[in-house]
UniProtKB/Swiss-Prot annotation:
Cellular localization per UniProt: Cell membrane
Family: Belongs to the YSL (TC 2.A.67.2) family.
Record's protein name: Iron-phytosiderophore transporter YSL15
UniProt cross-references to NCBIfam families, sorted A to Z: OPT_sfam
GO cellular component labels: plasma membrane
PANTHER family: IRON-PHYTOSIDEROPHORE TRANSPORTER YSL15, OLIGOPEPTIDE TRANSPORTER YGL114W-RELATED
Lineage, broadest ranks: Eukaryota, Viridiplantae, Streptophyta, Embryophyta, Tracheophyta
Domain of life: Eukaryota
Induction note: In roots by iron deficiency.
Organism: Oryza sativa subsp. japonica (Rice)
An individual GO BP term: seed development
Amino acid sequence: MEHADADRTRVAPEIGSLHDEDAEADPARAREMERLQPWREQVTARGVVAAALIGFVFSVIVMKIALTTGLVPTLNISAALLAFLALRGWTRALERLGFSPRPFTRQENTVVQTCAVACYTIAFGGGFGSTLLGLNKRTYELAGNSPGNVPGSYKEPGIGWMVGLLLAISFAGNLSLIPLRKALVVDYKLTYPSGTATAVLINGFHTAQGDKNAKLQLHGFLKYFGLSLFWSFFQWFYTGGNACGFVQFPTFGLKAWKQSFFFDFSLTYVGAGMICSHLVNLSTLLGAVISWGIMWPLISKHKGDWYPANIPESSMTSLYGYKSFLCIALIMGDGLYHFVKVTGVTAKSLHNRFNRKSVSNTASEEGDMVSLDDLQRDEVFKRGTVPSWMAYSGYFLLSIIAVITIPIMFRQVKWYYVIIAYALGPVLGFANSYGAGLTDINMGYNYGKIALFVFAAWAGKDNGVIAGLVVGTLVKQLVLVSADLMHDLKTGHLTLTSPRSMLVGELIGTGIGCFIAPLTFMLFYRAFDIGNPDGYWKAPYALIYRNMAILGIEGISALPKHCLSLSVGFFAFAVLTNVARDALPARYKKLVPLPTAMAVPFLVGASFAIDMCVGSLVLFAWNKMNKKEAAFMVPAVASGLMCGDGIWTFPSSILALAKIKPPICMKFTPGS
């Protein structure tokens, strides 16, 4: 967002009007607001069970995405929808059986959504498709024999150490900013657009109109869930070999198929394309055309000149090196620009606040605009306080545990690296959370990349790769989770949910995720060929992050011939596109591509970009035919497509472990 203050004033009236409309449409809402449940009653056993099930399903989905392309869409809206459908369906079923279940409130809905999101966030935020997988032997071998990639600098995945690492690093971020939650949410009135959007959705569910829509949404979800599950099951029968089945269907001909331009019938990515914006989807397609349609064929013509002809193309000193480092250049250019931008916006906003003439003047200026609803939300938010001493004590205790355990797991990580990371955590977390409240951009991954570079360079050649990957994961988790919690607290603020119940839901979800994510990952890791650059499970970000660590150790000497010049060009392109997006009028912004979205196909191929664009096409057509219906049905249908295809991965992995192979291999060859 280019003008955070303008966005804030735009969003707030919309929320207020929606609340007013809700109150008019549902008179019972006013009575419900007067008798809010105590925070302990907002965290229910049925809610935790529902959150665990939703978290498991979404963990499987995002794990599949993280291990194939790495471009994971935001599923918070889908989580809120499924939480509502599950618990509303449960209470209705009990009522029909003659029972009198406790009412299902928007506060319980909010806690369940928070718990489920915290659970599945571990599946992609924990680094299973990036930093943690970058530690394994296959990624070490793919990175090649460079000086920074020293022999033995790998650690094979294991449930024990992965669960231990996640338990050591995933909770502290939830506590670091608890004492500042009132300042960020109430005093500064930060928008946190994603949290606000989720709150508006949940408030809309718990109205008379929302109840009517829920029946249609449930029907749509179940219909497309069943369709997606059956299609995935049907496809499985034709994948009995290498490069077989509908996932290798040469939609645009065999020449295009060789350059990965084909539709692979992945309903997971069709659903993701319906959730992501048209700009994201078209950016991935543009990246696919530039890389697989233009760049890689041109670079391949210099085989034997730019890189040796007698080594496989999957080697880092071959074509794959160009793919990897040009992808990194786009991601780093995009990330650095946003880092500078958000830091500048944050500093400017804080400077303006601290230079106000007096608090009393500000209060008198804004006091007239405060509604009774706002006062009640603020009162509920302040009343559900969590003692600062408890948050500080918890953070300190978790820091001590991490300082002791992480160096035991990884001898390359010195204890003082961990102390520095935890000391910086609250400072970086506040800057990131404040920026996310203004811009809706969570910079946790960028802080993690910077930490990866710094600690890899600091640790040196022998220890740098593992130290950089592990400490980068630690910093990313500390910063990422604190901003996610503030988004959730904003949702709770607007749904009159106690901060205590929100924090409890967040901690429960995180704890569940610390076990579900490693178990799901290890199931996939043992059943499928994870990390094969020529296979389906490419896991591109594992090699990207390992190469970042090597780059931090070696500098530009790690790059293949002419790769530096190309990387500088792509880095500059990423920066300039962002400058153009912020400088151009609003109507032209949609024409400027997103560099990070463009970068993903560089390694994983064009097929997933085509899947995403099919999802965009479905959304576009639906909006043209019936925009009102599409507004509330698209999240349900997209969730059904993603859940059905994603859940099939679970039984298919069990079949693979049991050595049960599909009976048919469907391939396509040129005609005679």
